[in-house]
Amino acid sequence: MSKKEEKVLINEEIVDLTDRVRLVDGEGEPKIVDSSKALEIAYNKGLDLVLVAPNANPPVAKVMDYGKYKYEQEKKKKEAKKKQVKIEVKEIKFTSKIQENDINYKVKHIKEFLEKGKHVKLRVFLRGRELATPEKGFEVINKVWDMISDVAEKQNEPKLEGNYINLLVTPIKKKIKK
């Protein structure tokens, strides 16, 4: 259990915490009873008394099977995690002296990644004197962009960051395949 999660109080822990609870037992309206009486009702039914709203006044306790409740909570958490979309960013590196056939080969891979819905970071590595005149690197990035612009969107303009010229491209929304 992580630190963020609050511990759910059950059975005797509720009796130790408070004298009275608002009891929800599935049979009609919630009613305010002594916590020991609520625990007795739960035990008579062969179930647990679970504190579902500790901050209410009085706290709300429900008669239920704690194991089943815990299982349902885990199931909901897993379902929520499945629905989260994790964006994967692939990185393709170039140099400013790259040959035409190498560009074509890398562009083919970029298009494959974009078709799968992945984001692609294009990086041109500049060495030594190339840093003084990064125009060649921008030419390479722009050439690659011209080749993939039909299947991608620019997230930003190419920019020089340290020894690299970076450009992040994402798939055009309607062109994504799974």
UniProtKB/Swiss-Prot annotation:
<dbReference type="InterPro" id="IPR036788">
    <property type="entry name" value="T_IF-3_C_sf"/>
</dbReference>
<dbReference type="Pfam" id="PF05198">
    <property type="entry name" value="IF3_N"/>
</dbReference>
<keyword id="KW-0648">Protein biosynthesis</keyword>
<dbReference type="InterPro" id="IPR019814">
    <property type="entry name" value="Translation_initiation_fac_3_N"/>
</dbReference>
<dbReference type="InterPro" id="IPR036787">
    <property type="entry name" value="T_IF-3_N_sf"/>
</dbReference>
<dbReference type="GO" id="GO:0016020">
    <property type="term" value="C:membrane"/>
</dbReference>
<keyword id="KW-0963">Cytoplasm</keyword>
<dbReference type="GO" id="GO:0032790">
    <property type="term" value="P:ribosome disassembly"/>
</dbReference>
<dbReference type="Pfam" id="PF00707">
    <property type="entry name" value="IF3_C"/>
</dbReference>
<dbReference type="GO" id="GO:0043022">
    <property type="term" value="F:ribosome binding"/>
</dbReference>
<comment type="similarity">
    <text>Belongs to the IF-3 family.</text>
</comment>
<dbReference type="GO" id="GO:0005829">
    <property type="term" value="C:cytosol"/>
</dbReference>
<dbReference type="InterPro" id="IPR019815">
    <property type="entry name" value="Translation_initiation_fac_3_C"/>
</dbReference>
<keyword id="KW-0396">Initiation factor</keyword>
<comment type="subunit">
    <text>Monomer.</text>
</comment>
<protein>
    <recommendedName>
        <fullName>Translation initiation factor IF-3</fullName>
    </recommendedName>
</protein>
<dbReference type="InterPro" id="IPR001288">
    <property type="entry name" value="Translation_initiation_fac_3"/>
</dbReference>
<dbReference type="GO" id="GO:0003743">
    <property type="term" value="F:translation initiation factor activity"/>
</dbReference>
<dbReference type="InterPro" id="IPR019813">
    <property type="entry name" value="Translation_initiation_fac3_CS"/>
</dbReference>
<comment type="function">
    <text>IF-3 binds to the 30S ribosomal subunit and shifts the equilibrium between 70S ribosomes and their 50S and 30S subunits in favor of the free subunits, thus enhancing the availability of 30S subunits on which protein synthesis initiation begins.</text>
</comment>
